[in-house]
Amino acid sequence: MKIPFIRCYANGNDFILILSENFPDIEAKKSIIQRLCNRHTGIGSDGLFIISPSKKKDFLLDYYNSDGSWETFCANGSRGVSLFMYQSGKVGLKMKFETGAGVHWSEIKSDTMVVMRMRTPEYKSEELNPEESAGFFVHSGAHHFVCESDNLEEEYVLNLGKRIRQHQLFQPKGINVNFYKLGTDGTVEI
């Protein structure tokens, strides 16, 4: 079976993008997604988007983690999808799209800048401290643990992020982990 796809990269993550007309609607969807996302035997990616027509908005997005599980939303990858949809002539510079977490908006500013407007997070926890890293549980369409850190070096973030993701507080599924640093000029580095 041949499935045409696009690969995109956003903030250190990579994603496979497939138009729904090119993806078979079959029972084996989960296993196909697992095989495609496998970095050793497949294309390899952090997740996969299936892009479908929408009767209400510009398009509909279904996001799947690399293990084949469906997730309501992935903001990072949605930026890549937005750029692809614009560059392929399917939408204009500004677009609205449906996800499992509701409607989101994006605007193409350049080939390297996509601005997203997301809905307000549904809830946030009291401060949690897994792996001695103070932060908050936030649901912005997908589950995230967000913590401030002065160190955003890749090795540090990967090692601590992996430990937090697998911490017993977030089992059995784990959690997306984000580190941020506040700049003196009011910017936020993620």
Across the structure, where does each feature detected by a protein language model lie?
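Short, surface-exposed, charge-dense and proline/glycine-enriched linear segments
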Residues: 73-84, 122-129, 141
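A glycine-rich beta-to-alpha transition motif near the start of alpha/beta enzyme domains, typified by
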Residues: 1-110, 146-190
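Internal active-site segments that recognize and position negatively charged phosphoryl groups
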Residues: 129, 133-154
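Active-site glycine-rich loop that binds ribose-phosphate moieties when present
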Residues: 118-135, 162
